[in-house]
Regions:
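Residue-level detector of alpha-helix boundaries and kinks
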Residues: 35, 56, 99, 160, ...
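A diffuse structural propensity rather than consistent per-protein peaks
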Residues: 35, 64, 167, 285-287
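Active-site-proximal loop/turn and secondary-structure-junction residues that shape catalytic pockets
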Residues: 31-35, 56, 88, 126-130, ...
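Conserved beta-strand positions in the central sheet of alpha/beta enzyme cores
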Residues: 49-51, 84, 123, 194, ...
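Ligand-binding pocket scaffold of soluble enzyme catalytic domains
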Residues: 2-10, 17-60, 67, 74-78, ...
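Structural motif corresponding to the early beta-alpha repeats
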Residues: 53-176, 187-188, 238, 301
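Histidine-acidic metal/acid-base catalytic patches
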Residues: 2-25, 39-43, 93-96, 104-105, ...
């Protein structure tokens, strides 16, 4: 059997297939490794875009042209594309500590390498601590495990041992300093940066502020250097966790060309920022078809990551360690759902032209 790059057998090309193009989103999964079995499994799901958390050699300080090209070529051997790499700016940048200029130079060097090797997106976080202590697993449909967050579990937690705290104003000063240094380089390199919202979006994380815990913060962040290269990871789940309409917020940032990556998941929010449950992608408060339709309407051309599938028996009984912490069956479900939403949105909008 001979398949083309999109994974479609010659005999069924054109038979009801909506290909991902330069004017449509592309589904992605994060891979823990680039082994043959991992690449094969995501390709079987129709995933074309690959994301990774870092190079197999470590953080940004290990980046060079040869190293990044090796990863890109490895993915290309499977007729897939490496299109996003997560990175950690480092504590000295986030806290504004001595040595941050050296760390900013490390980020700049990595961006320039990414540009030379045609890596289109680099995604990052900017927080002192991710307050995951507020999560617990609660039962969902059929006994599946859902991630539940409540701020009461973490609101009085002290800083971690040996760690300091930082105010919201200080964080804004530090991210401003950072962005003004790196965004001009990203523009020259044609590499878009995507800052992920705080998730969980609690106002305080072990005594420190969180700049990306409100939509107002997202807007402020993108206004520091108004550029498509200074963008966000638009997460429709986090948007709903904050009590906002995901379609409206998607349109706001899309009109400014500052959506550089998308996370696609559903939630049930009881109190914005403070109390919510991540649920199966087909059962929450987010109108997932409306979100996908808005992205398709915008001709958003970058990655969509259908993240955070609930725990399920299949993954518990038959773990697979190549894809985002042993949740292959869960991701098969979320990928299939996201692909169906995208195909439906493309077909619907084509029919109304």
């Amino acid at each position: 059997m001979v398949y083309n790059k999109a994974g479609i057998h010659d005999s069924i090309k054109g038979q009801g297939h909506w290909p991902e193009t330069e004017e449509t989103p592309t589904i992605t999964l994060f891979l823990d490794n680039l082994d043959d079995r991992s690449l094969r499994r995501v390709k079987q799901l129709g995933v074309l875009g690959i994301s990774i958390a870092q190079l197999d050699t470590g953080g940004l300080e290990t980046w060079n042209d040869e190293n990044l090209k090796r990863h890109i070529d490895r993915v290309a051997e499977a007729d897939l594309e490496l299109r996003n790499i997560m990175f950690d700016p480092g504590e000295r940048i986030i806290f504004g500590q001595p040595g941050r200029n050296e760390d900013i130079e490390t980020v700049i060097n990595a961006i320039q390498i990414a540009g030379r090797q045609s890596l289109p997106v680099m995604e990052y976080n900017f927080y002192p601590h991710r307050i995951v202590e507020g999560y617990k697993v609660v039962p969902g449909r059929g006994g599946s495990g859902l991630m539940d967050f409540n701020n009461d579990r973490i609101k009085d937690l002290p800083p971690l041992t040996g760690k300091t705290t930082i105010s919201l104003d200080e964080l804004w000063d530090n991210v401003t300093y950072y962005l003004k240094a790196v965004i001009p380089v990203a523009e020259d390199a044609n590499v878009r940066l995507a800052l992920h919202p705080n998730d969980p979006p609690a106002p305080i994380s072990r005594g420190s502020g969180q700049i990306m815990s409100t939509v107002e913060g997202w807007k402020r962040l993108t206004d520091i250097v108004p550029s498509p290269y200074n963008g966000i990871t638009f997460d429709c789940g986090v948007t709903r966790e904050l009590g906002h309409d995901p379609v409206e917020i998607c349109r706001y940032f899309g009109e400014r060309d500052q959506i550089n990556h998308v996370h696609f998941r559903n939630v049930v929010t009881r109190t914005p920022n403070l109390d919510y449950t991540e649920v199966w992608v087909d059962e929450g408060q987010v109108d997932m078809f409306a979100v996908m339709s808005e992205l398709v309407r915008q001709k958003y051309p970058r990655l969509i990551y259908p993240e955070h599938p609930p725990e399920n028996d299949s993954d518990t009984e038959f773990p697979f360690d190549g894809i985002s912490a042993t949740t292959y069956t869960g991701f098969a479900y979320t990928v299939g759902y996201a692909r169906a939403m995208m195909q439906a949105a493309l077909a619907t909008q084509a029919a109304t032209k």
